[in-house]
Amino acid sequence: MGIFDKLTGTRYPETGVAARSAAEVRAALLAVNGPGVPFVVRNGAPSERADLVAVCRVRELGLTVRTRMRLVPEQHEVRAIDEQWEAQTREYARGQVTGVARDWTIERGTDGRPQITEGARFDFAAMKNPLRGAVLDAGWTWRGVVFRL
């Protein structure tokens, strides 16, 4: 794995894992949906230029994260790019989203001094790890893309 792969979050399957068909990979990614996950995986619209899209909305933070995925059967890889919108600051970011989003509140403590408390928190790995795991278990490469699919 090279430095660019590390920066983009590209992961390769374990050696010896047989690559499945594109239909099986699509089914595995759609099977990630469920009541215990904080996002929804759906088929991509033609305007999104993606085969599958995972969308997560965190209302407490005013944050929307979308991962667009394109299946490339010839190379047995899923190309993924993340997009992030913040409602409060109207910021938009595209590329590979990593880290944790937090909301902090400053209030006075019982002793009268300022106190910082964490209000809401969202770890982007909670969205990407199940998707990446489904792709790697199918024997395909998860290739993070920076600019476009």
Model features per residue range: what roles?
Residues 1-149:
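A composition-biased, non-transmembrane "mature-region" signal
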